[in-house]
Amino acid sequence: VEARDDEVIDNMQQALDRAVENGVKNLVVQPTHLMHGAEYDEMTEAINGYKDKFESVAIAEPMLGEVGDDATVINDDKKAVAQAITDTACKEAGFDSMDAAAEAGTAFVFMGHGTSHTANVTYDQMQTQMENLGLKNAFIGTVEGKPEDTACDKVIEKVKEAGYKNVVLRPLMVVAGDHALSLIHISEPTRHSLIS
C-alpha cells in the first residue's frame, strides 16, 4: 500500500505501540477477519501481550461470530452474512431472488479460503445457515478444500446432484485477493467442464 498509494498503515505491533504512546486507556479492537482461525488467534495473542498497558481491552468477534462445536451451530452473524451475500449475488447476477435463480437452474457457490484450523467448521455452519434460510441453491466451498466436504470436487458433486446447470462463483472472503481472482477468472471451457 505504501509503495502504491504512498500511505503508511501500521502493522499490529506498531498500532499497539502507538496506542500505548498516545495514552489510550480503553482499547477496543474490531478485527477484519471473516472467522476465528490462525490469524485471529495470532491477533488475540499479540493483544493479550499488551493487556497490562491499558485499563481495559475488548476484542470483537470476527464477521461470522462465534464458532461453536459442530456444523449445526449458527448465529445471527452468520445469518446476516448469508442474507447479505445471497441478496447481493442475486442482484448482480440479474435475479430477483434466490428462488428465481433456482427456477432458472442457477446455483451460487460462495468460496472461502479454507483452513486446517479447528475453526474450519465455520464453513459447514454457513452451509447449515444457507439451508436453514431455505436457500437450496447456495453452496459453500473452499479454495484449500478444508474442511474436506467444502473441496471444489465435493461442491461440484452437490451442485450436480441438485440438478443445477448454471453456477455463479462468488468469494466468501473479506479480502478477495489472488484466490478470488483465480476463481472468478476461470476460463469459460474450464467452468463448463467443472459442471458438465
Predicted features along the sequence, with ranges:
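Single conserved hydrophobic/aromatic residue that forms the stacking wall/gate
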Residues: 184-195
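Redox- and metal-dependent alpha/beta enzyme cores, enriched for Fe-S-associated oxidoreductases
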Residues: 113-155
